[in-house]
Amino acid sequence: MMALCVMTHAVGVTVAARRLSVEQAARFSQWVWVFIRLAWLIVFLHLVEITLWAVLYLWREALPDLQSAIYFSAVTYTTTGYGDLVLPMEWRLVGAVEALTGILMCGWSAGFFFAVVSQIVHEHD
């Protein structure tokens, strides 16, 4: 599942990098729209990855229903960890792997976002 998340993120970030029209963002208001679109794309990628983990939990009957699986996955992926919903003992290590994956993917997203912002600011300084 971790590999699937990495592939999903890699494809999404690559598509974003190729489609962003950094050169066309000449004014501040245009930059803002580039940042907003990029932020939404990043959020969408994370939601897809959270859903992939949730489907795994549901498919393997580690959680009772889709709502619980998505909720648990979101809380785990973001490392919020409320603890109100837990996996069965044999699945707890998988939950930890999801949390590590979430940390890595969020870090990757932050780095990518920073790189785009830096490029825009540098090119239009």
Model-derived regions, located:
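Transmembrane helix-loop junction
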Residues: 18, 22, 58-59, 115
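Outer-pore turret/helix-boundary of cation channels
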Residues: 48-72
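Helix-boundary and loop/linker segments of multi-pass membrane transporters
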Residues: 26-32, 84-88
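Pore domain of cation channels
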Residues: 1-5, 9, 68-124
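Membrane-interface helix-loop junction between the first two transmembrane segments
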Residues: 10-28
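Interfacial helix-start motif at the membrane-water boundary
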Residues: 32-48
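Hydrophobic alpha-helical membrane-embedded segments
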Residues: 1-14, 47, 53
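Transmembrane alpha-helix boundary and packing residues in multipass membrane permease domains
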Residues: 14, 54-58, 111
